[in-house]
Amino acid sequence: MINYVYYMAKNKREYREVSMNEAKYAHRRSTVNVQFKDASGKALADTDIKVKLTGHEFLFGCGAFDFLPATDGKEMFVDRTEKWLDLFNYGTLPFYWGQFEKKEGEPRTELLMKAAKLMREHGAIPKGHPLCWHTECADWLMEYDNKTILSKQLDRINRDVSDFKGVIDIWDVINEVVIMPVYDRYDNAITRICKDLGRVKLVKEVFDAAKAANPDAVLLINDFNLSESYRILIDGCLNAGVPISAIGIQTHQHQGYMGREKLEDILYRYSFFGLPIHFTENTLLSGKIMPPEIVDLNDYQVDEWPSTPEGEERQKKEWREMYEILFAHPLVEAVTGWDFADGAWLKAPSGLIREDGTLKPSYHELKKLIHEEWTTELTVHTDADGKAEINGYRGQYSASGNNISGSFDVKKDKNTDVCILK
């Protein structure tokens, strides 16, 4: 039996008091004693050194689908990805099996590899989404019996996780398992094998395959159903030995922002497991809110769904509050907005930029928050040994002094570092 820990909380009231009010972002910072040296190895004693955070450890993310057409130099998408990179350090790339391998044996590995490497070249971390899902599944799987379908699913995971190892090391291994065996919108191969095996058995099979292909990968389970059913599923998976690295939480809020109380309740309930939490797919609108009677978001079909000035101000405020709540929680390691540009899914005004590429207020607000408020930039003075103590947000830092420069890291479990300035 797994020994779970209620993280920082004995009850909801205590949880909220601790996580939201006490040292709000102190858990995002660390102190490191850095020795600065020149290229010859001589300590830079009694020297002013300017240090600046250049890359957050925290994963500030967004859907990165635009990187695929950007690899061909398409102007609109190159412009979008440049704006994307000015804001984010983490992005989700599409590995939907039905798109990735429309014809059996012909995966789009080369295109996805180009996109992932393009992100890496600009300092962004790519995530693959998803390895197993009943929606967007490969139609050709339907020709096979369940045993063969499972075998091909595991082969697919082994192939793709192995091929992308070192480039993509974070994966949504399986998506939306709560609904998977009862999904009845259309017949598909993955729902078939989930019915046959059961949820926990299928989750264990696909996670074990991903872990075997890349033992160091971050492996997520991911779902939009945040009811007790998801908690029960996670509990069953962990007790079955499924190597879940982090819990994925989806919040597509097309029907209105859920607000602080509901967000804190989600954090409270999923902190129970003591695992890192990734908010993997998050949507906030800058236009008309979807009617509440819509059950499946995909059923809401409109000819156009414009962004409005009032909606853009609302979206800006909602994104800021949501980010502040999530960044304040010690177990949250990543937040990913789903659409970078309006009109990407359901034609919704859900992006941080408009369809014409102009920046919305929410883009400016998040850039201010991430790169101006949650940053560290200071000048330190070294001692006789060239050492200086630095306290700042964890991540990658640049250092400069005496017309030379270098870099170092501030990490949670790293008390000392050496920075060579050249």
Model regions and ranges:
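Substrate-binding cleft and catalytic face of glycoside hydrolase catalytic domains
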Residues: 86, 90-103, 112-218
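Beta-strand-rich domain onsets/edges
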Residues: 1-45, 50-67, 90, 102-103, ...
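Aromatic- and acid-rich polysaccharide-binding/catalytic face
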Residues: 85-99, 103, 157, 164-169, ...
